[in-house]
Swiss-Prot record:
HAMAP family: MscL. NCBIfam families: mscL, PRK00567.1-4, PRK13952.1. GO terms for molecular function: mechanosensitive monoatomic ion channel activity. Its main location: membrane. The lineage of its organism: Bacteria, Pseudomonadati, Pseudomonadota, Betaproteobacteria, Rhodocyclales. Belongs to the MscL family. This is Large-conductance mechanosensitive channel. It is found in: Cell inner membrane. GO terms for cellular component: plasma membrane.
Amino acid sequence: MSFMREFKEFAMRGNVIDLAVGVIIGAAFGKIVDSLVKDIVMPVIGRLLGGVDFRHLYINLGDQTYETMEAAEKAGAPLVKYGQFINTTIDFLIIAFAIFVAVKAINRLKRSEPPPPPAPVEAEEVKLLREIRDTLKRG
């Protein structure tokens, strides 16, 4: 079998195509969540906390002081951008929650397979008769 034919069979399997669609939808969903956090959630939280813009919260590890994070970045100062970390953490939590809800819904929609029937229980009389038979065969 040629390399190209093997690759075509691999690529056309349902699982590979499903995975590709999932990756594309996941990337688009990530952008939506990023916008939700940066443009809707964090401004509301910032407003409730006194007008804080989390994107611009940082700790300057350098010796000089700067008026803005952008000025410190431009000067090459070492920064701990904990505000962006907070945004990214909230992104993750929203995505994780959405995936949890989706998986839970999918599992609920799947029909669970009925459990296998229990093995038939042998009556004591049948066991006793088998033992007698086996003993008679031996002796």
